[in-house]
Amino acid sequence: MNRSQVAGKLKGQICQFAGKLCKGLPKVAGRFVGEALYGILSKQSVRVSEVARSLNEPIRLIKTENRLCRELGRRELGERITEKVIEEGAFHVKKDTLLIIDPSDVTKKYAKKMEYLAEVRDGSEKTIGKGYWTVRVVGAELETVKIIPLYERLYSQEAPDYDSENTETLKAVDRVRRHVGDRGIWVMNRGGDRRKLFAPFLDREIGFIVRLEGDRHLVYRGRKVLALDLAVSCPMPYWERVIKEERTGEKVYTIQVGFRRVRLPGRSEQLVLVVVTGLGIEPLMLLTTLKVVKSRKSLLFVALSYLRRWQIEETIRFAKQAFRIEDIRVRKYERLQNMIAIVAAAVHFVAVWLGEWLKLGILAHHALEAAKRLFGIPNFRYYALADGIKAFLEGSETPFRAAKAQPRADPQLMLPI
């Protein structure tokens, strides 16, 4: 395919995807979502002004901006889009797919008039500032680099409908589970080490791997013991070398693994504490519902499933960096939530929806940019794809409104990338 053909296919796929997301909504909503996706992908920006500029309409720019802002405020638009993204992604979730819950933030350092601004901890600068929280769910396989963006929602503790961070986490889990059922293994970092999350997880019979804080009490052989004390005394019969890819290169760790069978105080469920050493001063403690036996394969599956977070952390940051989410400038809370849902849909479009044959075409034409990302950056292809899509769409002379929806290729016929 030449450049114009690839650009045409991309526009058609955006139209097709937007139609899928907005099924059951007014036609004008589907048009808006398609335009928003096109603008975000072609400008790599969440600014309404940039999205408006990408459409190149034969009217004053402010008129286009006003129309987009009105549509962005459509009630429950984000909720409908999120539901459709989960529905699309659920097709790819298998029994052992890792469902990684990732809390994050959108920092607005200089904002003053955005609705329900709240205190957040800036994860990159390790400081407290103004902004919003997000919770996302990303599917991943242990043996591949592919990710499945499933869910993302922005919230504020200052909003009238806010209950708690635990409620937002459980809302994410329940919404995804409505589509994936019992498939998948839920993975959380230390933010999941809370009784108010463990109890609902166990009540729902969810398979999970959660990293523990050292001060968590567990029941071992009938006695309450600190998790850290159990970990320090745990036999470590197996070892493995793991590689962490960083911006400066690769770092090799030699880890050792062991386990103890435990319970949570006040609960009857048999759980397993998997202990991993070699990554830092204190051992890594993972509490899981998975069936674990004394074998290298069984223990390493749990350890490597959690460490899979390393490999996709950069990809999880992909949306934040590639589309400059923290540059978002709408003031109303519902519009903010709707825009985040559309950005999440754009990430899903790049990572999952696009047929592999089209991804190959984009990467082939954009080989130089892709090559620059081969070394030191995990999962470079998503960044390269985003850059390639931007280059094709920006260089296209045909207005987006002239694009026609393209039929989607059968997933079974797609080439592996």
Where are these regions (language model features)?
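Short amphipathic alpha-helical segments
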Residues: 34, 48-49, 65-66
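Polybasic, low-complexity association/targeting segments
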Residues: 52-56, 265
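Short, basic interhelical loop/turn and adjoining N-cap
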Residues: 55-67
